[in-house]
Amino acid sequence: MDAIQEVKRIIPEVQKYVNQRMEEFERLGREGWTHFDFRPFLDIDYDAGLFSELSFCILTANSSATLGIKIQAHLGEEGFLNKTKEELEEVFRKFGHRYAGQRAERIVEAREKFPKVKSLIEKEKNSKVIRELLADPKSPYKIKGFGYKEASHFLRNIGFKDLAIIDRHISRFLMEKGLLRQVKSITPKVYLEAEKALESLAKELGLSLGELDLYIFYIKTKKVLK
């Protein structure tokens, strides 16, 4: 089955959950907070703010969305903003995160950059410009642990719809469908190639990249998460 047919086949099954998630993302970007409800895929719902979403994207890199969601639900905005590095590390270990110390350190470091990042998001409307600034090591906005994928993930989750999140599920789907050459790792060059392939697919399906990501994630995992 080609990519277009496969996505079209599952749209009726999960469209209401994808639409709900996109609304939750847009509210987070617009109002600075949102209420996420992951049922029926995970029996979890909670309020989230911008910094806790940034922290979620730091946590999920080379980990899983499910684990990130559980930790985010447990800590809330206040926990991510106020707990010490040691306290965060203890929570991450308790939940079984493989990189507990490293992620705690990165989240504490990100607090210093956050006011600057927040003002960048408010004034700059071009998502690709913001992504570059969040991922570029020479940028004053650089978040440690963010490359294109993590920056795109954060921006999609706060309402920017035109960026692709090339994680292992998405890259595998593209390679299986012959839309991306077989690669062992996702370099920035490969990332942009994959994003281009997804842009064409999204256009044919009449979807945004943000929506398409959720549909492909569902094809691969049977869950609509984030």
From Swiss-Prot:
Similarity field: Belongs to the type-2 OGG1 family.
NCBIfam families reported for this sequence: PRK01229.1 (NF002305)
Pfam families: Ogg-HhH (PF22175)
Sites annotated Important for guanine/8-oxoguanine distinction: K226
HAMAP family per record: Ogg
GO biological process: base-excision repair
Active site positions, chain numbering: K149, D167
Species this protein is from: Aquifex aeolicus (strain VF5)
Hydrolase recorded as keyword: yes
Biological role stated in the UniProt entry: Catalyzes the excision of an oxidatively damaged form of guanine (7,8-dihydro-8-oxoguanine = 8-oxoG) from DNA. Also cleaves the DNA backbone at apurinic/apyrimidinic sites (AP sites).
Reactions accelerated catalytically: 2'-deoxyribonucleotide-(2'-deoxyribose 5'-phosphate)-2'-deoxyribonucleotide-DNA = a 3'-end 2'-deoxyribonucleotide-(2,3-dehydro-2,3-deoxyribose 5'-phosphate)-DNA + a 5'-end 5'-phospho-2'-deoxyribonucleoside-DNA + H(+)
This enzyme's EC code(s): 3.2.2.-, 4.2.99.18
Recorded GO MF terms: class I DNA-(apurinic or apyrimidinic site) endonuclease activity; hydrolase activity, hydrolyzing N-glycosyl compounds
Record bears the keyword Cell membrane: no
Gene3D superfamilies: Helix-hairpin-Helix base-excision DNA repair enzymes (C-terminal), Hypothetical protein, domain 2
Name recorded for this polypeptide: 8-oxoguanine DNA glycosylase/AP lyase
Alphabetical UniProt keywords: DNA damage, DNA repair, Glycosidase, Hydrolase, Lyase, Multifunctional enzyme
Xref: InterPro entries: DNA_glyclase/AP_lyase_Ogg (IPR012092), DNA_glycosylase (IPR011257), HhH-GPD_domain (IPR003265), HhH_base_excis_C (IPR023170)
